From Swiss-Prot:
It comes from Mycobacterium tuberculosis (strain ATCC 25618 / H37Rv). The keyword Nucleotide-binding does not apply. Belongs to the mycobacterial PPE family. Coiled coil: none annotated. One of its GO terms (biological process) is response to host immune response. Keywords: Virulence. InterPro entries: PPE_C, PPE_dom, PPE_sf. The gene is PPE26. Pfam families: PPE, PPE-SVP. This is PPE family protein PPE26. Interacts with human TLR2. It comes from the Bacteria.
Amino acid sequence: MDFGALPPEVNSVRMYAGPGSAPMVAAASAWNGLAAELSSAATGYETVITQLSSEGWLGPASAAMAEAVAPYVAWMSAAAAQAEQAATQARAAAAAFEAAFAATVPPPLIAANRASLMQLISTNVFGQNTSAIAAAEAQYGEMWAQDSAAMYAYAGSSASASAVTPFSTPPQIANPTAQGTQAAAVATAAGTAQSTLTEMITGLPNALQSLTSPLLQSSNGPLSWLWQILFGTPNFPTSISALLTDLQPYASFFYNTEGLPYFSIGMGNNFIQSAKTLGLIGSAAPAAVAAAGDAAKGLPGLGGMLGGGPVAAGLGNAASVGKLSVPPVWSGPLPGSVTPGAAPLPVSTVSAAPEAAPGSLLGGLPLAGAGGAGAGPRYGFRPTVMARPPFAG
């Protein structure tokens, strides 16, 4: 199209009759919003994939996922840049229109020029309006040239503004053949599971049937040999009574072995009771008591022979301070009320307490070794210190 061949009425009417630059401004705003959304999505994708593949999800599957998503993230970043470029070009097109609109002659001026020319021509009877008609024609020519120049400039600016990079198709991040491969794998797994279930259902009765017979019925296995050595039969017992019968020899052996110490102690007790009954033990006790009395008669002479005074002894009497009984270390020497041991202490037989029951292996344990447990120093021992009572002086 040659804008120079069109009269100014056409060019001016076209510029003033259209929607103006509002659609291009709206398009620029929309492209800006799309660019921002694509950029935000690309940044979010990259952040999430990086955190997921480096912290929460590791391994070959994570690496494959990150490698597959990387081209798509790059495409979104490129698309965001292209959308920003489109917004810039749309703003440039709107600016070009505004410039062309400002340079275009308004249609009312062109219409006024044409009306003035027609009036001058109609009244030019004697040629008196020739100069005015020429001036009107010259003004119209200038309007034509101005509109043509504005349209040529607008066409050039629009051509530059429309030069945008075309958008590319987003990459395919999923394997097109993966769905078929997955379906085949699922079918194979289902077939394997079905065959396994069939084998299990078929083999279950056989396994249960094998439990109805003794486990060691065969005499060739190593367990059969072991059972033969222990119990003299290669067959495993099929009932509790048969098992107890096989274990009877071992039970008797363990019972006799465990009861052997009790048998020895019982025999010893029987011998002691028999000796008491026959008087072998009771007749020796008076002789021992008499011998002890004879030995005690020589105690007074022992003190004189050693150069000391007569031996004094007291039994069952504590030292006293006033009417209070005190330890011997508080009162010094024994009081004069204690008679010297001129005569031996009377010795008499002391009968033992009657035996409540015959002795056994599980009698009292000897505690003689525990007598000195508190005498020596002990680690971590904290002695108890008692305050001196007021009556002690």
